[in-house]
Amino acid sequence: MTETATDGHVVSIRDLWMSFPGKSAGQQIHVLERIDLQVTAGEFVCIVGPSGCGKSTLLNIVGGFLCQTRGEALVEGQPVSGPDPRRIFVFQENGVFPWLTVRENIGFGLGQKSPEKREKTVAHYTEMVGLNGFEAAYPRELSGGMRQRVEIARALAANPDIIYMDEPFGALDFITRLKMRSDLTRIWQAEKKTILFVTHDIEEAVQLADRVLVMSKRPATIQEVVVIDLPRPRDLDSHGYLERRDHIFRAMGMSVRIGESAT
C-alpha cells in the first residue's frame, strides 16, 4: 500500500537495495542492502558512515538521480521517478553560477514571480544568510563559505519542500565549517525545511541533526539511528553532546582517541 504524505513521512524508504555493474561480465557491486528509512516533515536528518559506504548513493536515489535495484523510495507519498524542482540539492562542489552576481544567483529560478516579489524574496534570503552588502559581487570575489551561503540562499529562495545536502561544508576550513553549521542551524530553525544531510563528520552531524543514521560498511545497511534530543544551539562541550558524539564513534568501530580502535 502506498504511503501518503499525510502520514507525516515526507521520505519513506522500504527494503531498498542498490547494486552497480562491476568490471567483469556479470559482476555486481552491492552498495546498499535492506535500507529502511522514514523522514518526518520539518526534520533534520544526518547520514554518516565509512567512506564509500553509499551515503551519497542513497541521497541520489531519494533525489531522483539514481534508480534503486529493488525496494521502494517514496517522497511525499509518490515513487521517486526523477529530479523534482520541489526538492533542491546543495552539493560540496561550488554550484553557484560564476557569471551571475550574488543577487542573480539567489534569484535564479524565480522567473515565475513578479519583479517585486522576486526582489523581496532575494532580499530576504540575502539577509538571512548574512550577505547584505555583497549583492553585486561575483562568486570569484567571495570566500568559500560565502559561496556556500549563496547556494543555501538560492535553495531556500525556491521554497522547496525538501533540501538534500551532500557534504556541503566538506571543502571549507575548520573555522568556516563551525560558522556555517551555526548559520545553518539558525536558518533551519527559522524555515523548518526538511533536510537530509550527508556528512563524513560525526561532530557536524551531532551539532546539526534531530537524528543521525549510522551506516555500516559496504554493502551498507542502517546499523543504528541515534536521536539527538539536545537543545539548539548545541553546546559542543556539554555532557549530552559529547556522549552522543562518542556513541556514534563507537558505533562506527572508531575510538575518539587517535590511533585506537573501539573494542
Listing of model-derived features with the role each one plays in the protein:
Residues 48-50:
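The feature captures the beta-strand-to-loop junction immediately N-terminal to the Walker
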Residues 116-134, 186:
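Conserved ABC ATPase "signature" region
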